[in-house]
């Protein structure tokens, strides 16, 4: 398949600027692959599609406030610093993106906070916008991390043109987020409320938690027409033995296994044994799933509506079937479903 197969016109007004008032009251499109049908529901109706013993695979990564605003020494120019990942805790080295990047050179110092209580020095250029920063801070490591949290902003995606609000800190986070390390939320999980999780539990549905720390690569546009030439950024992945046991037992008894989000799907597809069972994993993955792809574990998935030419859309095409996905997306646009991080959801069965 080619990149051009994933182009479609998405009206700007369908990009969700805000989340639904209640998590589980966003809209849900249910796409049935066997029947080729499309239904329109509310997200809380997802309960009707699962039975006792079915498993939902959840990504329990937690978004940290990765967007900082600082000032450059001497000129005082305002610089956005986006924390990508910690390289060395002891030396307080971080891989970051800076904007505007043009004048941020090795040796420059950046000051953060009204009282300049946090200082960082640029020690390397990694890409055109990428830099390595060393933070200069006298307190303990815990105090340093608290300072980053205090100064940082929730990293809502750039397509959202409004200012960040205090509500974003809560709503751009799943209710089951535990392991801090993501710079973007695994957005399919945002639709689950505490009440819905409880109802699923009462019905006998099980949860298998995996951790994939979502990086900014999730938003990277694909720039090659031949998809096999696209390279994904690596993301940190951890799958415990406990999660494997839950998923493999469900597979054995032929229960439904549902990947909640593209990140959960990438996680489990990155660690499949030759017997097509789930293996524990602790490392990095750069797996890129695009058509054709033979999925080993999940029998259904929940996902949001994605932007044109995104790697996320390519995975959906591989799982759903390209023609049915195109039909579903055309229907979503016609019915004015909301797209992207704060948008509506799709259940593919």
Swiss-Prot record:
UniProt keyword Transcription regulation present: no
Key word S-adenosyl-L-methionine present: yes
Reactions this protein catalyses: 7-aminomethyl-7-carbaguanosine(34) in tRNA + S-adenosyl-L-methionine = epoxyqueuosine(34) in tRNA + adenine + L-methionine + 2 H(+)
Pfam families found in the cross-reference section: Queuosine_synth
Keywords in alphabetical order: Cytoplasm, Queuosine biosynthesis, S-adenosyl-L-methionine, Transferase
E.C. code: 2.4.99.17
Protein location: Cytoplasm
Transmembrane stretches, start-end: none
Associated pathway: tRNA modification; tRNA-queuosine biosynthesis
InterPro entries, A to Z: QueA, QueA_dom1, QueA_dom2, QueA_sf
Superkingdom assignment: Bacteria
GO annotation, biological process: queuosine biosynthetic process; tRNA wobble guanine modification
HAMAP family, per the entry: QueA
Family listed: Belongs to the QueA family.
Quaternary context: Monomer.
Purpose: Transfers and isomerizes the ribose moiety from AdoMet to the 7-aminomethyl group of 7-deazaguanine (preQ1-tRNA) to give epoxyqueuosine (oQ-tRNA).
The protein's name in its UniProt record: S-adenosylmethionine:tRNA ribosyltransferase-isomerase
Species this chain originates from: Flavobacterium psychrophilum (strain ATCC 49511 / DSM 21280 / CIP 103535 / JIP02/86)
Gene designation per UniProt: queA
């Amino acid at each position: 398949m080619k990149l051009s197969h994933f182009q479609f016109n998405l009206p700007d007004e369908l990009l969700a600027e805000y989340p639904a008032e209640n998590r589980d009251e966003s809209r849900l499109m249910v796409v049935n692959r066997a029947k080729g049908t499309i239904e329109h529901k509310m997200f809380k109706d997802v309960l009707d599609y699962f039975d006792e013993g079915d498993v939902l695979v959840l990504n329990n990564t937690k978004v940290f406030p990765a967007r900082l605003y600082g000032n450059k020494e001497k000129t005082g120019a305002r610089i956005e610093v986006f924390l990508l990942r910690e390289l060395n805790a002891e030396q307080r080295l971080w891989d970051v993106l800076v904007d505007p990047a043009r004048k941020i050179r090795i040796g420059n110092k950046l000051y953060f906070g009204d009282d300049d209580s946090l200082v960082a020095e640029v020690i390397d250029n990694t890409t055109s916008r990428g830099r390595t920063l060393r933070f200069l801070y006298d307190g303990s490591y815990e105090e340093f991390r608290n300072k980053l949290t205090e100064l940082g902003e929730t990293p809502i995606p750039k397509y959202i043109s409004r200012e960040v609000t205090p509500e974003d800190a809560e709503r751009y986070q799943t209710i089951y987020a535990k392991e801090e390390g993501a710079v973007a939320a695994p957005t399919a999980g945002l639709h689950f409320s505490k009440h819905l999780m409880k109802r699923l539990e009462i019905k006998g549905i099980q949860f298998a938690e995996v951790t994939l720390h979502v990086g900014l690569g999730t938003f990277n546009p694909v720039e090659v027409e031949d998809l096999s030439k696209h390279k994904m950024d690596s993301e940190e992945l951890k799958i415990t033995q406990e999660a494997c046991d839950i998923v493999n037992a469900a597979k054995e008894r032929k229960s439904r296994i549902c990947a909640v989000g593209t990140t959960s799907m990438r996680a489990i597809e990155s660690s499949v044994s030759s017997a097509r069972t789930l293996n524990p994993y602790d490392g990095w993955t750069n797996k890129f799933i695009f058509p054709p792809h033979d999925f080993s574990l999940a029998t259904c998935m929940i996902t949001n509506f994605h932007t044109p030419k995104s790697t996320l859309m390519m995975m959906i095409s591989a799982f759903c079937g390209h023609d049915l996905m195109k039909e579903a997306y055309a229907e979503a646009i016609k019915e004015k479903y909301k797209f992207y991080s704060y948008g509506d959801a799709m259940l593919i069965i």
